[in-house]
């Protein structure tokens, strides 16, 4: 039986309509809609079906910092610098309900898996939980001592995780409203956090350019990635739990293979910081947004082949990796607080895999050529933009001359 290598991710579509940096993206349940928030104070709902007009929702008085579809896809929540949360019906009417949520910027909004409640995080240092349909404040979690950038429910709705500028990630029990554990290993502000689809792990991104993965049962640091050259602004787990995508101020997106504990792909698409990223509910697509005002939709491709099958063929039987939904302990990490380089992370405690030298050389050559191709395309895009600008200027000058010469 032959196993085919996963294909590279490909840029499927890109949407232009925002007038300032994109701050957040999220897919609806059926992947037919994609929502994005922006510093331009608007919320856009894009349709994946070609030639379908997007919805622009204007209601917030300041920058929209976060968006999240309800599990059913019938509602869409947004948070803003105007200190409010709005719950929208994502149709052409764009009707919304306003929650006077916080006393400072709302940084994050996330629905519980049952859709009955949602959690918000704010610069007022609090995390708040709300009833969706009764439109009522339920309770507040307030142990952070600086801005709270992000808060998420666990898949089963029992836990809440929050990330803060106080350099901690806190795990909360929703029922007791107590802080279960504080993770303090980040060396800078923690920008984003999310639960693994299994609910057994969390991943957090930081201004210290790192991504860290912890077990929420043992609170052990499982994986530590230092692959970006600037702050990591957002991350998203693939629904299978096998992959993680990150967005960074170094303008790249990176796909991490969590089963192997290594970098799979680096994607260059945005001109400037990549500010947000999210997988679709099926994992077939992921979307990214950036300070370049663009929303990009990528086809995953790499998840098409059954992951367990690939490993079974490529690896000796003794070193097969689990293809279950739980995140394996890929390799023992050094004690928390001590950094590790990318090279040591990839080489530490890994079984040797027999790969012919000729194949290795060929693959390295292909990777090098792809990097050259990526840079070439980027340069061509820049030149095309300059040409378009010059052509536009020529046309405008021609129109002015025509107007002056017309009696």
Curated annotation (Swiss-Prot):
The entry sums up its family as follows: Belongs to the WD repeat POC1 family.
Give the keywords, sorted. Answer: Cell projection, Cilium biogenesis/degradation, Coiled coil, Cytoplasm, Cytoskeleton, Repeat, WD repeat
What's the subunit arrangement here? Interacts with POC1B.
* Official protein name in the record: POC1 centriolar protein homolog A
Signal peptide range in chain numbering: none
**Compositional bias annotation for Polar residues:** 342-357
One GO cellular component term: ciliary basal body
A biological process (GO) of this protein is:
cilium assembly
Q: What residue spans do the WD repeats cover?
A: 17-56, 59-98, 101-140, 143-182, 185-224, 227-266, 269-308
Function comment: Plays an important role in centriole assembly and/or stability and ciliogenesis. Involved in early steps of centriole duplication, as well as in the later steps of centriole length control. Acts in concert with POC1B to ensure centriole integrity and proper mitotic spindle formation.
Q: Which domain of life is it from?
A: Eukaryota
Q: Which residues form a coiled coil?
A: 369-397
Spell out the CDD domains in the cross-references. Answer: WD40 (cd00200)
User: Which PROSITE patterns does this entry report, sorted A to Z?
Assistant: WD_REPEATS_1, WD_REPEATS_2, WD_REPEATS_REGION
* SMART domains in UniProt: WD40
Species of origin: Bos taurus (Bovine)
């Amino acid at each position: 039986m032959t196993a085919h290598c996963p294909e590279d991710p490909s840029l499927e579509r890109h949407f232009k309509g925002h007038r300032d940096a994109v701050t957040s993206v999220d897919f609806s349940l059926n992947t037919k809609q994609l929502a994005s928030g922006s510093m331009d104070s608007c919320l856009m709902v894009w349709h994946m079906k070609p030639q379908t007009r997007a919805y622009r929702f204007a209601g917030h008085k300041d920058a929209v910092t976060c968006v999240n579809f309800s599990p059913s896809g019938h509602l869409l929540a947004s948070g803003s610098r105007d200190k409010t949360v709005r719950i929208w019906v994502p149709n052409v009417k764009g009707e919304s309900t306003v929650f006077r949520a916080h006393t400072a910027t709302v940084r994050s909004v996330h629905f519980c898996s049952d859709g009955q409640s949602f959690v918000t995080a704010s610069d007022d240092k609090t995390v708040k939980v709300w009833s969706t349909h009764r439109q009522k404040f339920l309770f507040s979690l307030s142990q952070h001592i600086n801005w709270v950038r992000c808060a998420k429910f666990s898949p089963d709705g029992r836990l809440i995780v929050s990330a803060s500028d106080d350099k901690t990630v806190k795990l909360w029990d929703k029922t007791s409203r107590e802080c279960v554990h504080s993770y303090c290993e980040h060396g800078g502000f923690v920008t984003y956090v999310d639960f693994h689809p299994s609910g057994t792990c969390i991943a957090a991104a930081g201004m210290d350019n790192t991504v860290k993965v912890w077990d929420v049962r043992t609170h052990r640091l499982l994986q530590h990635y230092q692959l970006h050259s600037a702050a990591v602004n957002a991350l998203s787990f693939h629904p299978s739990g096998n992959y993680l995508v990150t967005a960074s101020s170094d303008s790249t997106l990176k796909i991490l293979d969590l089963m192997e504990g290594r970098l799979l792909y680096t994607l260059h698409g945005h001109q400037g910081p990549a500010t947000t990223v999210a997988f679709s509910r099926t994992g077939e697509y992921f979307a990214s947004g950036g300070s370049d005002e663009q929303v990009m939709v990528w086809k995953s491709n790499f998840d098409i082949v059954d992951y367990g099958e690939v490993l079974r063929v490529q690896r000796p039987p003794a070193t097969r990796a689990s293809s279950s939904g739980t995140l394996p302990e890929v390799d023992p990490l050094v004690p928390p607080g001590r950094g590790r380089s990318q090279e040591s992370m990839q080489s530490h405690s890994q079984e040797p895999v027999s790969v012919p030298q000729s194949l290795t050389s060929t693959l390295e050559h292909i990777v090098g050529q792809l990097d050259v191709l990526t840079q070439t395309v980027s340069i061509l895009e820049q030149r095309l933009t300059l040409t378009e600008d010059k052509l536009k200027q020529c046309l405008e000058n021609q129109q002015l001359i025509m107007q002056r010469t017309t009696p």
